[in-house]
Amino acid sequence: AILEEKYAKQIALVLDAAEPGMTISLDMKDAIDIAKKENSDLGSIVSIKDNLVVVKLSEKGGYSYSFFNDLQFDGVISNYYLNQAKTGFIFVIG
């Protein structure tokens, strides 16, 4: 739960400072290692909708945190995805 809170807040702060054209990489290896132990779908441990970041490392729990930047993650803002090494996420700001 502590890592979920940490990363939800960190991602929200990064998105608040983001501008179109930016690509942001975030190392989340410690959180991803926990999600693997919990047999979670690694691609869905981070979700973003309606200015709300949710980080969920297991079936139970999760932590959400809102951001204020008027970015939209519905195709306008390209996307976010697990990096190739599966150690973090990449956020592409459209």
PLM segments and residue spans:
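Long, compositionally biased, intrinsically disordered regions
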Residues: 1-94
